[in-house]
């Protein structure tokens, strides 16, 4: 429907730009970059960056609308989101690569995306944050205990203990 048409006509939304990033072991990681609305390639100001990690882990990101990504971009952040190993949509090998091994292949891919962000001309490499919910929160927790490259971190409804998750989960 076009229920929100009048509202959307008043807003300038960020459009995700598709990227492919090569992980250290040669795996290609599908990613998207959303710059603040109105920012052009001629803009010299470097913005804070936010690396978003999806839940699941067997979920996936794409070019669909994410309210929280638009809010962050509108606030002046460059938002980067990707589908590291463990994500759906790239075949069985990609999806099952982290089975019983969270924090290995997926972590390699997350680090590759972070390295991409540190080199991106629109992103201030000293102001990169990481965030995610559920499994994305787990990987955010993993990241901040395995590197100091992130200036900030937000975990939302995160998995912090796999044993307690098994005993208290709705699944």
Which residue ranges define each predicted feature?
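Proline-rich low-complexity regions
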Residues: 14-16, 36, 48, 57, ...
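Active-site-proximal cap/loop segments of hydrolase catalytic domains
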Residues: 81-171
């Amino acid at each position: 429907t076009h229920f929100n048409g009048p509202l959307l006509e008043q807003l300038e939304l960020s459009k995700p730009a598709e990227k492919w990033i090569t992980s250290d072991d040669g795996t290609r990681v599908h990613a998207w970059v959303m710059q603040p609305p109105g920012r052009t390639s001629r803009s010299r100001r470097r913005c804070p960056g936010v690396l978003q990690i999806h839940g699941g882990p067997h979920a996936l990101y794409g070019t669909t609308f994410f309210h929280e990504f638009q809010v962050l971009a509108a606030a002046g952040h460059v938002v980067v989101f990707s589908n590291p190993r463990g994500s759906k949509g790239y075949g069985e090998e990609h999806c099952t690569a982290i089975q019983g091994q969270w924090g290995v292949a997926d972590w390699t891919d997350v680090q590759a995306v972070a390295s991409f962000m540190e080199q991106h001309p629109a992103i201030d490499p000293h102001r990169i944050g990481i965030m995610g919910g559920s499994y994305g929160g787990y990987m955010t927790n993993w990241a901040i205990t395995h590197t100091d490259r992130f200036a900030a971190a937000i975990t939302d409804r995160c998995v912090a203990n796999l044993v307690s998750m098994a005993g208290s989960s709705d699944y």
